Curated annotation (Swiss-Prot):
Residues given in the record as [2Fe-2S] cluster binding sites: 63
CDD domains per record: GRX_PICOT_like
Protein name: Monothiol glutaredoxin-5, mitochondrial
PANTHER family registered for this protein in UniProt: GLUTAREDOXIN FAMILY MEMBER, GLUTAREDOXIN-RELATED PROTEIN 5, MITOCHONDRIAL
GO cellular component: mitochondrial matrix
Encoding gene (name): grx5
Gene Ontology MF: a single term: 2 iron, 2 sulfur cluster binding
Residues annotated as domain Glutaredoxin: 38-140
Key words of the record: 2Fe-2S, Iron, Iron-sulfur, Metal-binding, Mitochondrion, Redox-active center, Transit peptide
Major localisation: mitochondrion
Annotated compartments: Mitochondrion
Residue sites binding glutathione per the record: 55, 92-96, 104, 117-118
Boundaries of the annotated transit peptide in chain numbering: 1-25
Amino acid sequence: MNSYLFRIGSKTSGFLRSTQFVRSYSKHVKSESYKKALEDVETQVAESPCILYMKGIPERPECGFSNTAVRILQAEGAVFTSYNVLKNNDMREAVKEFGDWPTIPQLYVKGQFIGGADILMGLYKSGELSKLLNEAGVVKKDE
């Protein structure tokens, strides 16, 4: 998957590359429920203009990184759907595989993987996130 991170030319650390190797080396036989979860992620990403896979719900995030991602999106006025990956372990693992990204939260806008909390924070601080969300048409308009 061609993520926003890689489109803007960011490089991954050696640690991330080694983590990806271990994950690909240790992949287990996929259960039917896992395959279904992977299909569900693909469908959700395709059908949702802006979706955040997170731990918890926006009103009650269950980890600091998910909280950060939610607060950033709210500060930008983004209209987004969320999915609590803690409800389903197959879904949590499917999200990680789909985005080829080892951590949660994960944000997708118009089918494109944007990143996790740290990347969102960097994009937010630089103003790039505002531009990206506005261009995607996922920001609430003042009436």
